């Protein structure tokens, strides 16, 4: 099966290139990118089974979403791995990373294997995060070694801030030992009067307490300092801070 994708605008992140070209695909594998003259015969003379006109469209490698909520297991009335994967594929995403805030939480190898095995039945690559703390309670670490060996790619209590500095430090030390990244939900709930609105002129006018930026500053600063101390790899996955503000702490 030979397919010619014509007139597409190619985005090539690996080579930091962006250009217009035709792509020849043979049996599902790219065999040629025709920008000026990559073949000894004109493009129009190449025998193909299918021609796709991509004029005005972007042609790129499969996109990767490192933070998805497929709600499976436990909340499949919202979404499940099959429907989530289908939606991802329709949008050009060929690889996704599911968060661990399911029911049961992905804090054990059995639930992790459920997600991974069900993901293998879909047309895309479905990976899973695992919880930092058991039950997302922020009190005791999960078995990082077992979860890494089971296929987890990152540890996160997504959606739940970790309040204990000592637990965070312990998690970073273990993650560093295993060469695994951590991802944090950066808000200090003790400093937030009302979720859903930033603390500022509008919240004051509406007489709603709001969530001040400082509730995020302090958590980002804390975790960056602990990461510097432990040499752990971390990601700030949830923040509303502006780049120039966050930069003061990163």
What is the predicted function of each stretch?
Residues 239-246:
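Conserved small/polar residues in nucleotide/adenosyl-binding loops
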Residues 1-45:
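N-terminal metal-binding scaffold of metallo-dependent hydrolase/deaminase domains
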Residues 40-59:
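Active-site metal-binding motif and surrounding structural segment of the metallo-beta-lactamase
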Residues 108-112, 116, 137-145, 192-198:
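Distinct, well-ordered alpha-helical segments
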Residues 160-184, 188, 211-215, 219:
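Metal-dependent enolase-superfamily TIM-barrel catalytic cores that perform enediolate-based chemistry
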Residues 54-119:
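Metal-associated gating/positioning segment near the N- to mid-region
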Residues 82-106, 122-134, 148-163, 179-187, ...:
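Divalent metal-dependent hydrolysis catalytic cores, especially in the metallo-beta-lactamase
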Residues 91-93, 116-125, 187-230:
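Active-site gating loops and adjacent loop-to-helix segments of metal-dependent hydrolytic enzymes
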């Amino acid at each position: 099966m030979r397919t010619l994708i014509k007139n597409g605008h190619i985005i090539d992140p690996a080579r930091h290139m962006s250009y217009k070209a035709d792509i020849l695909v043979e049996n599902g594998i790219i065999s040629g990118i025709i920008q000026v003259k990559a073949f000894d015969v004109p493009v129009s003379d190449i025998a193909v089974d299918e021609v796709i006109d991509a004029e005005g469209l972007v042609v790129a490698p499969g996109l990767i979403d490192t933070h998805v909520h497929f709600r499976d297991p436990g909340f499949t009335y919202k979404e499940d791995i099959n429907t989530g994967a289908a939606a991802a594929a329709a949008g050009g995403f060929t690889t996704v990373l599911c968060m661990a805030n399911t029911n049961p939480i992905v804090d054990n190898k059995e639930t992790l294997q459920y997600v991974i095995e069900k993901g293998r039945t879909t047309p895309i690559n479905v990976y899973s995060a695992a919880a930092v703390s058991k039950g997302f309670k922020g009190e005791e670490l999960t078995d990082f070694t077992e979860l890494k060996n089971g296929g987890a790619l990152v540890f996160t209590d997504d959606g739940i801030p970790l309040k204990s500095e000592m637990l965070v430090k312990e998690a970073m030390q273990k993650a560093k030992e295993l060469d695994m990244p951590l991802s944090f939900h950066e808000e200090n709930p003790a400093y937030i009067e009302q979720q859903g609105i930033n603390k500022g002129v509008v919240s004051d006018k509406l007489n709603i307490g709001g969530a001040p930026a400082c509730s995020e500053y302090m958590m980002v600063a804390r975790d960056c300092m602990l990461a510097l101390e432990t040499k752990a790899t971390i990601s700030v996955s949830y923040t509303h801070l502006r780049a120039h503000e966050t930069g003061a702490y990163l």
